[in-house]
Amino acid sequence: MLLCVLKIYIIFCLVNDGAGKRSEVRGRTKTYSHNSRGYFRKERGMGKNKILLVNTKGFDQPHIGQGSFGLVAELFDSTRTDTSRKEPDINKVKLFSTAAHANKSSRNIGIFRRKAFNGSRRNIFSRQPFNKRNTDVTEKPGAKMFWNNFLVKMNGAPQNTSHGGKPQEIMKEACKTLPFTQNIVHENCDRMVIQNNLCFGKCISLHVPNQQDRRNTCAHCLPSKFTLNHLALNCTGSNNVVKVVMMVEECACEAHKNNYHQTAQFNMDASTTLHN
């Protein structure tokens, strides 16, 4: 009889011990974070404001603290009932790792730098379009083309035939008046130095071959406005020497339709000096 009572007592104790363990397991409230490196779990028997940090990476002994994690969470109430096994999403603790965030930022910076380097390298080594217009040498109509067209015109071509030269290029003349220092010299006389002007430039000339009257039209840069001055030189002797000098004021291109052209005579020597 005593043996039966002892067996019943042992069975009753075992049943109560298993039921207590199951209720303790059900009473625990677990909260997991969305981070794969760890989660937080709140124990019912640990107090009101204590959080148990469980490291899921190594599954070592749990420790209480914050570690290297930044936590923004709302603590659960310790007086929660055992009937609520499922927890709503609003009570879950969101956890992020500062180290993982730093690694992600460094990876993003590295990707941005690689993209920028590749873009700059493409800009440097990109093929530039070949511009054929810049390589071609532009040939302007010169004297040869003008002469050939002129010969065609003079050999029986119609009167309205146009030549290849441009009027701006054909009629381009340059006749300038340049100042210089002129020396008047004579034998047994002192040298006289005066300030005068000379004519320098490019004018149009025209020669028509195979013509009976041999008409030539030439234009020369000649004085268009001048004065004649008589200069008396200081000489050693009884004879007085007077020189007639053309004092040039303006120059222009003048055409002559003769076989010869008139040139102006200047009393100049090798020591003549031009002034710019």
UniProtKB/Swiss-Prot annotation:
From what superkingdom does this record's organism come?
Eukaryota
Q: Where is the CTCK domain?
A: 175-259
Q: Pfam families from the xrefs? A: DAN
PROSITE patterns associated with the record: CTCK_2
Q: InterPro entries from the entry?
A: Cerberus, Cys_knot_C, Cystine-knot_cytokine, DAN
Per the UniProt entry, the signal peptide is: 1-20
- Per the record, what is one GO cellular component? extracellular region
Q: Which cysteines are joined by disulfide bonds?
A: 175-221, 189-235, 199-251, 203-253
Q: State its role.
A: Inhibits wnt, nodal/nr-1 and bmp signaling in the embryo to promote head formation and anterior neural induction. Within the endoderm, acts as an essential mediator of nodal/nr-1-induced cardiogenesis in the overlying mesoderm.
PANTHER family registered for this protein in UniProt: CERBERUS, DAN DOMAIN FAMILY MEMBER 5
Similarity section? Belongs to the DAN family.
Supply the name of the protein: Cerberus
What is the species of this protein? Xenopus tropicalis
